[in-house]
Design a protein with these regions (language model features):
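HhH-family (HhH-GPD) DNA N-glycosylase catalytic core used in base-excision repair
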Residues: 1-194
Length: 194
């Protein structure tokens, strides 16, 4: 597997971030940077679930459509969505119109609306491993798809009635939200926001 490679500006990046401008911007400014706040984490949780079985680029390019369709991923607003809203979502070409994923998003919002402020943030971040125990990956082959922490997080979320989040999706969430820094050792973005 490949290590960091130079982008057009000559600075080394994770290879996956070089394929499109959308990926490059996401790689450089978002992925692996700490995300906090229940609504912000709910958005990432939902988008990671919608990505399941698809490319992340598909989700990135529809992210604004998702934000519009799901009331900016404000938990309290999505929790109030009705059957008419669900039908609207199923007809919205700006998002992924997968009934199971839409149902899970609406059900998850209803569950999370009953949690206290900051509870989702605290729960997710409680699974962040100690960075000192994780060596910087040198190649993409060194980056896991699942870890004991992501497996435990997925199990905990499921126990709390959060749907459509298995260990792989939980690990992708951990990567995207900065719980782990899986930028390659030589990548210019490694350590960003820490």
């Amino acid at each position: 597997m490949s290590g960091a490679r130079p982008a057009a500006d000559g600075r080394p990046r994770c290879p996956w971030g070089l394929s499109t401008e959308d990926y490059l911007a996401y790689h450089d400014t978002e992925w692996g940077r700490p995300v906090h706040g229940d609504d912000a984490l709910f958005e990432r949780l939902c988008l990671e679930a919608f990505q399941s079985g698809l490319s992340w680029l598909t989700i990135l390019r529809r992210r604004e459509g998702f934000r519009s369709a799901f009331a900016g991923f404000k938990i309290s607003a999505v929790a109030e969505f009705t059957d008419a809203d669900k039908e609207r979502l199923l007809a919205d070409a700006g998002i992924i119109r997968n009934r199971a994923k839409i149902d899970a998003t609406l059900a998850n919002a209803k569950v999370l609306a009953g949690w206290g402020e900051g509870e989702l943030d605290a729960l997710i971040w409680s699974y962040a491993p100690d960075p000192a125990t994780r060596p910087a990956p040198r190649t993409l082959g060194d980056v896991p798809a699942v870890t004991p922490e992501s497996t435990a997080l997925a199990k905990d979320l499921k126990k709390r009635s959060i749907r459509f989040v298995g260990p792989t999706t939980a690990y992708a969430l951990m990567q995207a939200c900065g719980l782990v820094d899986d930028h390659l050792a030589d990548c210019v973005a490694r350590g960003g926001g820490r």
